[in-house]
Every structure is written in structure tokens, then in C-alpha cells.
Amino acid sequence: MNSDLALLRLLQLASPGLPVGGFTYSQGLEWAVEAGWVRGVDGFVAWQREQVHDTLACLDWPVLARLYHACQAEDAAAFGHWSRFLLANRETAELRLEEQQRGAALARLLDGWQLGQAPAWRASLELSQLGGMAWLAAHWAIPLRQLALGHGFAWLEGAVMAGVKLVPFGQQAAQTLLRDLGNELPAALDQALGLGDDQLGGGLPLLAIASSRHETQYTRLFRS
């Protein structure tokens, strides 16, 4: 696939229109706002910056890279291992369910395109959205770095749009946040791609607590 088509496919994978329900989850932010842990734009920036440099850089991106390389090598066993590793590192039932729901939705999209149907791959593809993204990126010859940045921006955009509704703040502030927090993604990715297998894993206790409390939050805008 030429570079222009690879770019278009990347934009498709990173699009908020991808039918995986990306904008239906707040990943604990809804409870954090209600509890007063996140107040105003500055509080939101601090909350998301921790996730960029912990969850994204120390877990999601390194695992995405390993899933991508497993697809390139046609190593279904390694792909399954890292898919399960990612799911095991989601610290709450809510976060694990979100991961599986996104993965199943993307797997159904692959079914519609008659892709990823081999039994050795199909079950693992349902475990996470990252698995489906890695599989499609390898299939479409999207470079790993571009894939990771596209995924990171899509994740950040989803978080900022949740912040618009919950914190709240306006669209001007939202775009400024996307610009400023987005500036931190390339350096965080450099760190992520340099980690060894024994260095992978993130842990944000307040995020885990917020996600757990969100499961039983009385009134919610976002899915649990």
C-alpha cells in the first residue's frame, strides 16, 4: 500500500466515527469530577498528563508495538499473549469490560471485511481494540510510529471531549488542551518504544478507584 493510502487508513482507524464506542466511556473521569479530584482545566490537565506518561507510555503503546510486530511476524501466539497481558493490566472490571467491548466491536468490523478470520487470531482480536488496530495497521502497512501517534491522539481527543461535558470547559479550551497535551505525545512515545518486556505496566491508584466508584455512581453520562 502506498503512503497516501496508508495515511488515509490511519485517519480511518483514529477517527471518532470508528464504531467502537470511544466517546461512551470516561475512564474514571466522571467520578473524579464528582468527587472533586478534578477541578477546572488545570485539574484536568494534571489528570490526563499522568495517564499520558503512565498508562499510555508504559502500557498501551509498548503493548501496541508488540502486537504490531507479532502481526508482522504472523505470530498468533505472541499476539494472544500480549492481548491477554493488556487485559490483565486493566485495573478494574469497568476498564476490562470497556477494553473487551471495544475489541469485540472492532472484530465485528473486521468480520464485515472478511479479515482476521483465522481461528488462531480471531479469539485474541476480540480482547482489545489495540489488537484490532495493530492487525489492521500491519495489514495496511501503516508505520508503527504513525499508528501509535494516531491512537494516542484519538485517545486524548476522547478524554478531552469527555472533559467538555464533565469538568466542564468550552471548545476553545478543548482545542488548546489537544494542542498542548498533544505536544507531549512524541517524547512519551520515544520512551514507550524503548521499554523492555520487564518494564511494562502502569499503575494509577486514583484512576482505579475512580473507575471502581463509577461502576455504581448514581447518575452517569458515560457508560460503565
Curated annotation (Swiss-Prot):
UniProt-listed Pfam families: UreF (PF01730)
Primary localisation category: cytoplasm
GO CC terms of this entry: cytoplasm
Keywords, ordered alphabetically: Chaperone, Cytoplasm, Nickel insertion
Location(s), subcellular: Cytoplasm
GO molecular function: nickel cation binding
Transmembrane spans: none
Family membership: Belongs to the UreF family.
Function: Required for maturation of urease via the functional incorporation of the urease nickel metallocenter.
Subunit structure: UreD, UreF and UreG form a complex that acts as a GTP-hydrolysis-dependent molecular chaperone, activating the urease apoprotein by helping to assemble the nickel containing metallocenter of UreC. The UreE protein probably delivers the nickel.
Protein name according to UniProt: Urease accessory protein UreF
Name of the gene: ureF
